[in-house]
Amino acid sequence: MRRLFLPLGLAVAFLSPNFAVAQSDTGTSMVPVFPREAAGPLTLEAALSLAAGSNFNLSAAAKELDSTEGGIMQARVIPNPELKTLVEDTRKSTRTSTAQMNIPIELGGKRSARINAAERTRELAQATLAGVRGDIRAQVIESFFSVLIAQERVKLATGSADIAARGAQAASRRVAAGKISPVDETKARVEQANAELELAEATASLQSARQALTALWGNASPQFAEAQGNLDALPSRPAPELLQKELENSPLVAASRAELDRRQALVGVERSRQYPDLTVSLGAKRDTEANRNMAVIGVAIPLPIFDRNQGNLYSAIRQADKAQDEYLANRISLTRNLLMASNQLSVSRASAQTLKQTVLPGAEQAFNAATIGFEAGKFNYLDVLDAQRTLFQARIRYLGVLGQTYQAATTIDRILGR
């Protein structure tokens, strides 16, 4: 009896958790460290580098990809054997003891189906990571140029406020000299107050844009002095036909396709579970009363009479059909958004060029002429205010069109994963 159960006891001891290989604990609590950009000028390359190294959405997607390796590792594992003991009769002289090992054997391709599903999950995580990386890059570029535009708006509002202040002073002098009505001075003061409000709003918008940019690498308090970049270099992208061809390699399309593949792989997993597994039993039986040992050999297989995994298989098939529809719908949506962004980019570029080459120079000439004419007494102050307002609106519109241009370009890059 002792000889029979000694190997069993040793096996149980070695298989206990105390003898298991210790796994490293990566879930320790730690305080996140948020990087800060340099206090000097900030370039687009520096902003992209900071976001790539410190954005938590990006690191979370990378860890999700890393976790799928564990799923593949587990999918490759075969089922554990089972040790079983049985004692018949508690009297020592007539006791019968049995020790056996039950070895499950998977049938129906369950292991290969599991591995295939786990690998498809890894591909989905890879495509998701690429999509997140492209999205973060597009966000950084869009936010960076938003800061550039906000900086220009502050400069514009500052200049407009200075012009309005000088105009109010000039109007005051002309009123004192009796050359214009005090009503014109009041209008000049109102225009000066409006210009100061525009400057305050532009300053607040710049601060919000700066915070939105640095938040992409976890810094809530911007440290950089200013963003350095060239707004005059308008972005350009290939023709819509070429963009549609690039869409095939987009991470967003790849992620949708990978989800479809994963769902189809899960159908294979559920289909493999329709086949019952075989259990082979090997062991020894000790009959103390007869003083003899006997071999124990057995085979067990479930009869799939009622449960054939039909419900889970049906659900998996419908989920795969759903993934197919979502993939097609996603492609249609991405194509539509891509073409809309391409059209918006073309229109915005044309508008920006027209404003820069025609509207802005004309508005500046009209304002300069009105100012000189007012100082010479040829125009009234209403003409100056009207010219100043036209120039300011033209510049604001130009900055708005620039923002639309860069937004359309970054939308294209986000869709294509550039």
UniProtKB/Swiss-Prot annotation:
The keyword Membrane applies. Induction: By zinc, cadmium and cobalt (zinc being the best and cobalt being the worst inducer). One of its GO terms (molecular function) is efflux transmembrane transporter activity. It holds the Pfam family OEP. In the presence of 2 mM Cd(2+) or 4-10 mM Zn(2+) up to 99% of the metal is removed from the culture supernatant and is sequestered via bioprecipitation. Additionally Cu(2+), Co(2+), Ni(2+), Pb(2+), Y(3+) and Ge(4+) can also be removed from culture supernatants, although it is not clear which efflux system is responsible for all these substrates. Its main location: membrane. It is found in: Cell outer membrane. It comes from the Bacteria. Residues 1-22 form the signal peptide. One of its GO terms (cellular component) is cell outer membrane. The keyword Cell cycle does not apply. Keywords: Cadmium resistance, Cell outer membrane, Cobalt, Membrane, Plasmid, Signal, Transmembrane, Transmembrane beta strand, Transport, Zinc. One of its GO terms (biological process) is response to cadmium ion. Belongs to the outer membrane factor (OMF) (TC 1.B.17) family. CzcC protein appears to modify the specificity of the system, perhaps by acting on the CzcB protein. When the CzcC protein is added to CzcA and CzcB, the efflux system gains specificity for cadmium and cobalt. This is Cobalt-zinc-cadmium resistance protein CzcC. It comes from Cupriavidus metallidurans (strain ATCC 43123 / DSM 2839 / NBRC 102507 / CH34). The gene is czcC.
